[in-house]
C-alpha cells in the first residue's frame, strides 16, 4: 500500500495532539483511502520557508499552527473557502501539483460552541487564529470586538467591521476568547483585574490552548464563569482538515468520532 506523509508545522510543536488524532484516523480509514498515511510534528525554525519545507519533506498535506498561519496564506498557489476572507491558512493540501490553502479553524471553532446563542464576543489577540474566529463570528451575526496590545494587524479587523481596541473596552461580552499565545507561556493575556470584570459579566471564557488548565481558564473557574479550552476546536478543525487530506472521501463527522475516541 502506498505511503503518504503529512504533518503539522509549528513553533513550539511538542505540545500538539494533532499527530495522535490524525494517525488514529489514517489507521482507521486506510482501506477507504487506499493509502497508509503518517502524520508527524514538524518544529519549524521561525525564519523557515514553509513551502520549501513542505516540498522538501515530500508531504501530501499539512496543518499549520502558531506562529505561521498568516505566512502560510502568502505561500499557497491557491486559496479556497473562508481562508480567502481571513488571510490565514491552517491546512495545506497538495492538489494536482499545486499547494492549496484552507482554513478549518473558523468552522471548527464555531462547531465547538455547540450552537449556543451568543450575541457578542471579545477576541484577545490579532494573529491568524484571531482572524479566522473573527470572520466566522461576524458571519454568524455576532458583534465582534478585538483587543490587542499593539496596533499590529488591527486594520484587518477594522475592515471586517470589528470594534478594535489597544486598551480594554469598558463593555460586557458574552464570549471572551483568548487567541494569544500567553497560555503556552503560562501567563494571563490581560491584566487580572480587567479579566475578572469581563468574566463576571460574560457567559463563556474560551481559551484556544488545550490539554491543561491555563491561567486564563483557572481564573474563570475561580469566578465560577463557564469555561472551555481548545480541545473541541482542535478536534473539529482536525476533522475538517482530514476531510481535505482524504479528498473528501471521508466526511468529517466520521473522522470526528474517531478523533474524539483517542483524545
Swiss-Prot record:
It catalyses: shikimate + NADP(+) = 3-dehydroshikimate + NADPH + H(+). GO terms for cellular component: cytosol. Shikimate binds at residues 16-18, 65, 90, 105, 210. The active site is at 69 (proton acceptor). Its EC number is 1.1.1.25. Disulfide bonds: none annotated. It is an enzyme of class 1 (oxidoreductase). Pathway: Metabolic intermediate biosynthesis; chorismate biosynthesis; chorismate from D-erythrose 4-phosphate and phosphoenolpyruvate: step 4/7. InterPro entries: Aminoacid_DH-like_N_sf (IPR046346), NAD(P)-bd_dom_sf (IPR036291), Shikimate_DH (IPR011342), Shikimate_DH-bd_N (IPR013708), Shikimate_DH_fam (IPR022893). Homodimer. This is Shikimate dehydrogenase (NADP(+)). It comes from Helicobacter pylori (strain G27).
Amino acid at each position: 500500500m502506498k505511503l503518504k506523509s503529512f504533518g503539522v508545522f509549528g513553533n513550539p510543536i511538542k505540545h500538539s495532539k494533532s499527530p495522535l488524532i490524525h494517525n488514529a484516523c489514517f489507521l482507521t480509514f486506510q482501506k477507504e483511502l487506499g493509502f497508509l498515511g503518517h502524520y508527524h510534528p514538524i518544529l519549524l525554525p521561525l525564519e523557515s520557508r514553509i513551502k520549501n519545507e513542505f516540498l522538501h519533506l515530500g508531504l501530501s498535506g499539512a496543518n499549520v499552527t502558531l506562529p505561521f498561519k498568516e505566512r502560510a496564506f502568502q505561500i499557497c498557489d491557491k486559496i479556497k473557502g473562508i481562508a480567502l476572507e481571513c488571510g490565514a491558512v491552517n491546512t495545506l493540501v497538495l492538489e494536482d501539483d499545486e499547494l492549496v490553502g484552507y482554513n478549518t479553524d473558523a468552522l471548527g471553532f464555531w462547531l465547538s460552541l455547540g450552537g449556543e446563542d451568543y450575541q457578542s464576543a471579545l477576541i484577545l489577540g490579532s494573529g491568524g487564529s484571531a482572524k479566522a474566529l473573527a470572520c466566522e463570528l461576524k458571519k454568524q451575526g455576532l458583534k465582534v470586538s478585538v483587543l490587542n496590545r499593539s496596533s499590529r494587524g488591527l486594520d484587518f479587523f477594522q475592515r471586517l467591521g470589528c470594534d478594535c481596541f489597544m486598551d480594554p473596552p469598558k463593555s460586557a461580552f458574552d464570549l471572551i476568547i483568548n487567541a494569544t499565545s500567553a497560555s503556552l507561556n503560562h501567563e494571563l493575556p490581560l491584566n487580572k483585574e480587567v479579566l475578572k470584570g469581563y468574566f463576571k459579566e460574560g457567559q463563556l471564557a474560551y481559551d484556544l490552548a488545550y490539554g491543561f488548565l491555563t491561567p486564563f481558564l483557572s481564573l474563570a473557574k475561580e469566578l465560577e464563569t463557564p469555561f472551555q479550552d481548545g480541545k473541541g476546536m482542535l478536534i473539529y478543525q482536525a476533522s475538517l482538515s482530514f476531510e481535505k487530506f482524504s479528498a473528501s472521501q471521508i466526511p468529517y463527522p466520521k473522522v470526528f468520532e474517531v478523533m474524539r475516541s483517542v483524545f
